[in-house]
Amino acid sequence: MKTRFAALAVALLVSAPVLAQSTAEPPDPILEAGKINARLAIEYMKREQLQAAQEKIDKALLQNPRDLSVQLAAGVVFERLQDTKRAEKHFRQALRTDAKSPEAQNALGAFLCRHGDHKKGEEMFLKAAANPVYRTPEVSYTNAGVCARSAGALERAEKYLRQALAVKSVYPETFVQLAGVMHDRGNHLQARAFIERFLATAPATADVLLLGHQIEMALKDRAAATALSERLRKEFPGSVQLRVLDDLERRNTG
């Protein structure tokens, strides 16, 4: 299953909060335009209209360079454009804009982990988790677990993920990550239990069904493995995960 980080900058930017105006003083139209252009840049990026995304984020940075959401959007867009130096610059600038922002800490942590600096990435996630203004520390603990797992540090990954469950006992993303870690560590019965907990609390995904199939095969429960593979074929017929499954089955029968 591919490495992924929970609840990061794109989702935050698309639904950026609007603060109530406390006085008659109107918002600066140029600053507001910068925020709007940052959100538009993310929308264009999601549609793979990358030139338009770059044009919008360049405008946003000219209009409102001191805004946290603008800097986070710039980091996301430039990383998608494979300009990692500019992306890192903007993720770090977001943190300088608000050193206590858990969103900025999470975004920089994810960037560092994606680009191989697992130690510093984990440190940023743990800072976010310990941030007293952060309402969802389970997200950062889960992200720290993903980061540690991608570095091959499975024991540390399990520790972070169990910290996430200690904060919030029902968080599906933590369940699936723990299933992966337990499977990697050879503890397939516990891995199965976490897949079951995920499927009891969230809709199935192609990743989860494929991982569940692999776990059941490791447990030599062919009936359970077949049930999950049939679900994958029925619910996600055009998925990459189904192609992976087909390749695995060809190798097993070849």
Stretch-by-stretch model annotation:
Residues 29, 63, 96-98, 131-133, ...:
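Structural marker of alpha-solenoid helical repeat scaffolds
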Residues 19-64, 245-246, 250-254:
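N-terminal leader/linker segments that initiate helical-solenoid repeat arrays
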Residues 46-47, 80-81, 114-115, 131, ...:
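Register position in tetratricopeptide repeats
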